[in-house]
């Protein structure tokens, strides 16, 4: 199958790699021949909910590398990012950005930053949120809070 884009970008914290992250990453590799992955630095995540429970950058990086290896993905580059835009406004050859419904507004910010630098805006490829069994979506925040597992299943509380 021919992939519609030569180079795509996707970004995130990718803490406790869950089904939502995997769907996002799979879509990026499905539509792009080469995937740039922006992985948030430890400094960037300090103000996230349950920040103290977010895995360090190196462990999140290892989880991504393991996921890519298991799935046979070899056409990628992971770059540490310190801002929401990261490097997406500096690589001229990017053609698309892959986001979830929830992060669509971030793609608009990336495109605005690209236009300010005289670069062509990216096509926006959007995936639906992956639902959990207890709420509207699987999220790392719910996992860090101990409410669900990475598959969206509720965790049993000790009585």
Swiss-Prot record:
GO terms for biological process: coenzyme A biosynthetic process. It holds the Pfam family CTP_transf_like. Pathway: Cofactor biosynthesis; coenzyme A biosynthesis. GO terms for cellular component: cytoplasm. It catalyses: (R)-4'-phosphopantetheine + ATP + H(+) = 3'-dephospho-CoA + diphosphate. InterPro entries: CoaD_Thcocales, Cyt_trans-like, PPAT_arch, Rossmann-like_a/b/a_fold. Keywords: ATP-binding, Coenzyme A biosynthesis, Cytoplasm, Nucleotide-binding, Nucleotidyltransferase, Transferase. It is found in: Cytoplasm. SUPFAM superfamilies: Nucleotidylyl transferase. GO terms for molecular function: ATP binding; dephospho-CoA kinase activity; pantetheine-phosphate adenylyltransferase activity. Its main location: cytoplasm. Its EC number is 2.7.7.3. Gene3D superfamilies: HUPs. CDD domains: PPAT_CoAS. It comes from the Archaea. NCBIfam families: CoaD_Thcocales, cyt_tran_rel, PRK00777.1. Belongs to the eukaryotic CoaD family. Reversibly transfers an adenylyl group from ATP to 4'-phosphopantetheine, yielding dephospho-CoA (dPCoA) and pyrophosphate. This is Phosphopantetheine adenylyltransferase. The lineage of its organism: Archaea, Methanobacteriati, Methanobacteriota, Thermococci, Thermococcales.
């Amino acid at each position: 199958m021919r992939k519609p884009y030569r180079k795509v970008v996707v970004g995130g914290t990718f803490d406790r790699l869950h089904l939502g992250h995997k769907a996002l990453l799979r879509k990026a590799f499905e539509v792009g021949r080469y995937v740039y992955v922006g992985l948030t630095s430890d400094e960037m995540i300090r103000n996230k909910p349950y920040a103290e429970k977010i895995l360090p950058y190196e462990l999140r990086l290892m989880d991504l590398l393991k996921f890519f290896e298991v799935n046979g993905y070899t056409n990628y580059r992971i770059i540490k990012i310190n801002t929401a835009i990261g490097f997406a406004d500096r690589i001229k050859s990017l053609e698309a950005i892959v986001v979830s419904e929830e992060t669509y507004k971030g793609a608009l910010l990336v495109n605005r930053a690209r236009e300010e630098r005289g670069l062509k805006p990216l096509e926006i490829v959007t995936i639906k949120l992956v639902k959990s069994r207890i709420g509207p979506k699987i999220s790392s925040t719910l996992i860090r809070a101990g409410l669900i597992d990475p598959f969206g299943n509720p965790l049993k509380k000790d009585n």
